[in-house]
């Protein structure tokens, strides 16, 4: 994606299932911390606004700290939190090396030397990236079983409803943030479960110390989660640690946010991305499991691991298709093939745009995340070229000689590395005209590969959201190479609707596809439809989310995809461009063909998997119409 879109965060959980001495003898000191560092670093694409790490120790004495948390919002947050986590151990290695080798001493005296870890990578889609907003969060209590550490990759659409419920119970939340509300929600049912067990064991005549031990053994995590998550509307992977050593990770019933896990006799590990687990622990693809929608993996203090159905899975899961197009790392085996398929499937539209003239066409990609889709497009170009060679040979079979064959076999896709982002370039100028000129130089281009006024130039991008980078930078700088025509190919379909499940795309007016549809309505004398959609949206503003209809679909209904793409081309083409320009998109059908198991396509279709989605798009349109630049949730 040539435009930066902040999106869902990343989680990493590690539970050591054997005594700490086992890992020291087999792997050496700090093995768990090193694994956590790798597990988070291999997911750093999921969060660069901040990072946090929590650790729970099991066998501490009263008065000893058993939960350690560190966070950083610096420019290198992962390195910072692990520098802090390793600090005690490195100091010991310098000053008291014998203690650095004493695992029992370390557990009782050094931080981050326990059995249970939870890491978080933050991309802030809402709120500031101050330390107080970074995960993991801690709900403290003097009872071990009431301490709750929480981190998640999530966004809930009905935080306002949950807040009202807490207030009705007599609580006074000091924050309205979704994480604070969720922490309190789970914490409330954790408290209730502890109180229920306490009364039960008290009636049996047990001492308070005995009761604490029994509660730790018999805490019903399934009941806590099912009660807490009953009314949640949104996409989430919620990870939690309880002070005595239980842990859980819960995935939403639509499977919107991704989650994978791996267990053996030494460890249990959970992460947002499968390749991170495979690389960190050197395990094969077949052994890393996907946490199914609505399920929770629960790891008890005694090492028992179970996967429980907490919420009824949706009959039509809506796993996020944007994960496959852009957000997740392309090193995942399935995602790699899906991105290649997207590149192949857009090829017919690209060929049509260049009038099938591959001899006089250079193909490339921008940015680097589009490289896999480019491979697929290039393969499809090669297939087309081979078909043309076969036709030429058959057409000239009675008149073939060496020269003719050489001529035929010279037809092949011309792949070149055309654009590279200059990551060191910063824009300090504030005047719009001068700043736009500087932005146009964010990308460097390779000269001498495009024949001026002869060649077409095709570049593929993962997706096009706002179109501002295209207009201000990419089209301008590609035009300097002198192509006859510039074709921008998006491997994703047109992004038409806001997200509300963890991606920072909540304002309709930001979307180039929406602006194109609005422009077409006005040009075609149909501006009244905009007013009508506003009236309908405003009329249902205060209805329950379950009753709200997505009327924004009516904005797009009068036009074909090609008409909207044509208007997008006009909107992203700057003045004084010499080359003819065209923007082409993949279709919804192609998306589903390439990504058959991740059918969450609300960005493109407006078909939201939860009622809260319709509420958000309704609010987004009202905000747009009224000139309100606020987020829709």
Feature roles, as predicted:
Residues 1-292, 298-362, 366-367:
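Conserved short alpha-helical segments that host acidic/polar catalytic motifs at enzyme active sites
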Residues 363, 370-377, 381, 425, ...:
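Extended, hydrophobic alpha-helical segments in both membrane/secreted and soluble proteins
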